[in-house]
Amino acid sequence: MKKKMLTGFRPTGKLHLGHLHGNISNMIKNQKEYDNFFFLVDWHALSTEYQNPENIKTDLMDCVTDLVALGINPEYTHLYRQSDIPQIAELTLYFSMFTPLSWLERCPTYKEQVNELKTKDLSTLGFLSYPVLMAADILIVNSDIIPVGEDQLPHLEITREIARRFNHLYGKYFTEPREMLSRAARVPGTDGRKMSKSYNNAIFLSDGYDTIKSKVNMMITDPRRIHPKDPGHPEVCNIFSFYKIYKKEGIKEIEKRCKEGKIGCRDCKKEISKIIYDSLAEFREKRSEIKRDINFIYNILEEGKKQVGEIAKKTICDVREKIGID
């Protein structure tokens, strides 16, 4: 039997390079090897967008379109909407009964986002309990493997702790999922922070060449390099991070030329802009084709709802029996 692999996306806007190289690439590469679950986390989106939820549905459909255009194949992957599986909410409730507040309050991702998103009121139960809902997302299908970026590891550890505590209290049932780190676990945004829609620093997959070029030109490269022929320090350069993704085979030569002052930051930015744009040519073509038949996406989500719904119903029946409220 194939192991289950699961990942989710917040439908709060268009997909960007951080998504693609964070975990989508892993899902595409491993589609035939695992039983795949790929879902859109519209409840999670409400944790930060509860004051302005009107765009979530539109963004969700755009997100599914992007995923299919990138190569996520419904024949190998269950594509579904979080809110279409009500059993996730019920499982979250059960987990919340025994999850200590200290587990949530110590989560570094929680503290980081509260500090970074100061314009939003995140002093809510929904935002604090984000990792509990995430645990329910994962454990409702008893997933074995979770593709994640480094910043999501603390959340996954909370999922393991919740599974552990449930198994201890009510008997062995849940699998403790393990992470699959992507090769580019942290893609830098235009300001040097992790690429994120929330930080307004993302290069989107649907961006045109001029937009990509403009965003790449905004990036900080080497603050110690004053003149183009000065020796460079690629280890601190955000543009060099993209070379690691897109030109893995020639990375040593690029690093050498940079350190010797034989290639300037402007040259690198120009090359990376073109590489990024050209790498998305097939995606743009497929996305345009899918957009001509929107029912195609609705049908995919409906099928995913049916398939995952059956799994979720069984999990909840088993959990109720374990707890003793069946």
Question: What kind of feature is each model-predicted range?
Answer:
Residues 2-136, 284, 288:
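N-terminal Rossmann-like or analogous alpha/beta NTP/dinucleotide-binding catalytic cores
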Residues 1-2, 310:
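N-terminal amphipathic alpha-helix/helix-capping segment at the start of soluble metabolic enzymes
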Residues 51, 147-150, 230, 260:
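Conserved aromatic-histidine-acidic binding/catalytic patches
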Residues 90-93, 102, 106-169, 173-191, ...:
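Classical nucleotidyltransferase
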Residues 11, 146-147, 201:
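A generic structural motif
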